[in-house]
Design a protein with these regions (language model features):
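Non-heme di-metal
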Residues: 2-347
């Protein structure tokens, strides 16, 4: 098990030559020098993430307060359980990202991880705002803690949670790779049954404020996915032994498990009882996402026949675009919130 070194905090003897900088095990000074970055992609990522700033309470949820009691039993059950799951995921992220950052020795990447951590806190704020608006305090607490009272949801969370705990308890190059892959799976696969549910509500004219909150969260998660994909690709160049045949097999199994868990979760929480969605649509879309994420790491497709976005699900990406020039009917403000062009990437 190869060692990974925790970066020092005060290090006057650190290496200031940017050409020597590495993702892990570099002798860093921790100085944030925006004019000298080892990884050129960081500048674009940083600017995009900064320009994506938003405030949850600026989105009007009055219509949602009226709509929520009118949802069908299946829709309300799915809304509650998906929101509980999202609360858990983003809370876990804001707690875990600093653990990863302690071992990342490229200071410009640490800047990105700090922004991501902040954005995960904004997402938690958003979910709290949604819950405070639509339900009473007792209902709120019940929804908030379904991530551990619902046995299916608890099992769902154990895979990523255990991988995160492993890195906290035993730091090595291998466990660092696994925790980064776990982040990649969480950001790129785990959210999407939930996202598609909210967007389906949106295209049926329900819960417009919740849909808009999710669109901004989705946009942030896309940048987080892009960040971890690039971190992994840099690791692949700098630590090629982490991407040998045995490690690729492990990565493959992790992604497959993430895909299968997301499909099972989507079919449990959405099923065939919600107008506009069914279990087959969930499975088709998540397998497509699994291929898309896996290919972005320079690997082949995992699932034959799922290479392209399913025709039945093309509306998901349309609803996910928070930068469409459009005025929200409930608040008369442009959803082109970002001040710069969104990062174009095949993720």
């Amino acid at each position: 098990m190869e060692e990974i070194k925790r970066k020092p905090l005060f290090n006057p003897k650190g290496d200031i030559d940017v050409r020597n900088r590495r993702m892990i095990n570099f002798n860093t000074t921790n100085i944030n020098d925006f004019n000298n970055m080892r990884y050129e992609w960081v500048s674009d990522w940083y600017r995009q993430a900064m320009n994506n700033f938003w405030v949850p309470e600026e989105i009007n949820l009055n219509q949602d307060k009226s709509d929520y009691p009118k949802l069908s039993e299946a829709e309300r059950r799915a809304y509650d359980k998906i929101l509980s799951f999202l609360v858990y995921l983003d809370s876990l992220q804001s707690a875990n990202l600093p653990n990863i950052s302690q071992y990342v020795t490229a200071n410009e990447v640490n800047l990105c991880l700090s922004i991501q951590t902040f954005q995960e806190c904004i997402h938690s704020q958003s979910y709290s705002y949604m819950l405070d608006t639509i339900c009473n305090p007792t209902e709120r607490n019940d929804i908030l803690y379904q991530w551990k009272t619902d046995e299916h949801l608890l099992r769902r969370n154990e895979f990523i949670g255990n991988l995160y705990n492993e890195f906290v308890e035993r730091q090595s190059k291998d466990s660092f790779l696994r925790v980064c892959i776990a982040n990649f799976i969480l950001e790129g696969i785990y959210f999407y049954s939930g996202f598609m549910f909210f967007y389906n509500l949106g295209r049926n004219g329900k819960m417009p404020g919740s849909v808009q909150e999710i669109r901004y969260i989705n946009r942030d998660e896309n940048t987080h996915l892009w960040l971890f994909r690039n971190m992994l690709l840099e690791l692949k160049k700098e630590e090629p032994e982490l991407f040998d045949e045995a490690h690729i097999a492990e990565i493959t199994e992790m992604v497959k498990k993430g895909v299968e868990q997301e499909i099972a979760w989507g079919q449990y929480v959405i099923g065939d009882s919600i107008p506009g969605l069914n279990g087959k649509m969930v499975e088709d879309y998540i397998r497509y996402l699994g291929n898309l994420r896996y290919r972005s790491l320079g690997l082949p497709n995992l699932y034959e026949g799922y290479e392209k976005e399913p025709e039945s699900m093309k509306w998901v990406s349309q609803y996910a675009d928070a930068n469409m020039v459009k005025t929200d009917f409930f608040e008369a403000r442009s959803t082109a919130y970002a001040k710069s062009t969104a990062i174009e990437d095949d993720l």
